[in-house]
UniProtKB/Swiss-Prot annotation:
SMART domains: Elp3. GO terms for molecular function: 4 iron, 4 sulfur cluster binding; metal ion binding; rRNA (adenine(2503)-C2-)-methyltransferase activity; rRNA binding; tRNA (adenine(37)-C2)-methyltransferase activity; tRNA binding. One of its GO terms (biological process) is rRNA base methylation. Keywords: 4Fe-4S, Cytoplasm, Disulfide bond, Iron, Iron-sulfur, Metal-binding, Methyltransferase, rRNA processing, S-adenosyl-L-methionine, Transferase, tRNA processing. It comes from Francisella philomiragia subsp. philomiragia (strain ATCC 25017 / CCUG 19701 / FSC 153 / O#319-036). Belongs to the radical SAM superfamily. RlmN family. Its cofactor is [4Fe-4S] cluster. It catalyses: adenosine(2503) in 23S rRNA + 2 reduced [2Fe-2S]-[ferredoxin] + 2 S-adenosyl-L-methionine = 2-methyladenosine(2503) in 23S rRNA + 5'-deoxyadenosine + L-methionine + 2 oxidized [2Fe-2S]-[ferredoxin] + S-adenosyl-L-homocysteine; adenosine(37) in tRNA + 2 reduced [2Fe-2S]-[ferredoxin] + 2 S-adenosyl-L-methionine = 2-methyladenosine(37) in tRNA + 5'-deoxyadenosine + L-methionine + 2 oxidized [2Fe-2S]-[ferredoxin] + S-adenosyl-L-homocysteine. This is Dual-specificity RNA methyltransferase RlmN. Specifically methylates position 2 of adenine 2503 in 23S rRNA and position 2 of adenine 37 in tRNAs. m2A2503 modification seems to play a crucial role in the proofreading step occurring at the peptidyl transferase center and thus would serve to optimize ribosomal fidelity. [4Fe-4S] cluster binds at residues 113, 117, 120. It is found in: Cytoplasm. S-adenosyl-L-methionine binds at residues 167-168, 199, 221-223, 300. The active site is at residues 93, 343.
Amino acid sequence: MQQDKINLLGLNQKAIEDFFISIGEKKFHARQVFKWIHKKGVIDFDSMTDLGKNLRNKLKENAEIVIPKVVFNKASKDGTHKWLIDVGGSAVETVFIPEEGRGTLCVSSQVGCTLNCSFCSTGKQGFNRNLSSAEVISQLWIAARTLSKNNGEHDFSVTNIVMMGMGEPLMNFENVVPAMDIMMDDLAYGLSRRKVTLSTSGVVPRIYDLLEQSGVSLAVSLHAPTDSLRNEIVPINKKYNIDELLEACKLYAEKGPHKHITFEYTLMEEVNDNLSDAEQLIELLRSREVPAKINLIPFNPYPGTPYRKPSNNRIHRFKEFLQHNGFVTTVRKTRGDDIDAACGQLAGDVMDKTKRKERYLKKLGDKNAI
């Protein structure tokens, strides 16, 4: 019985070296192939010209390099790109945001999301599955190739990665960490730990694991200054409360690549955007002695949501209050909203990307058939 071929795309350098040893080849060939895939964008073994013919044939027998299909690539009038990527019958989205001197790629980690935050459109799709490490890194591979063609130079690029797309990355730890290893490998994309940011809603045990095994920059989706409010809008808070979360954040700031944690705070009118909320947020972060930067995200409305985006005056007032109290505070610019690529909008053109309804109807049909 023929064994399934291994997809080399998602293997970090250590794993691809182990694979080459397992087929009786030397480690340095693994590094050659690794570089061909990620540095040069070559996925055909026969095009890897510094490999011998016998090795190329052996690789074709035992391995493959599979890139998911791009369903579409949309470009916004502000230069933002959004890719819809087919991952075995479901779909995920990846967004590239160009700014002066940098280009940020927002990468998805799951098909849908398990956490069901009340204000997030992605969570309304339900959850299908975790992405493989190959599916995670393929988003960067696809973006790098597309952007180099658009700009006529291979090195235009993605300078920063944010694991802030669809899904909770720390709920897919085993696949996200190897993919981030590839992002930071000098034989691949060569990004520093400071340039790769993982955003979590607060899977506290995995924050400690992340510090030990990866140490990329950390952002935390806080969104509320009290447990009572956070329990309502970020349900994982019922399992890992704010005290536990900030204790992990404090250690991460001490040991991680940045000496601060970025706290993301989605502003929703009359929910968490009052000055009393800002006062509580300041007291919370000061009392826990967590070095913090605060990134305010004006809510992006989507069909059926009960929440509203605050007025510009309310956003400005909240930001000014935090700044006057000594906190570095930014307001995230809304980018790509004309192609549903703005933060919280990654449910996009095909609302049921996780096939939730389809799976439910099939299950119902199977039960009726019994």
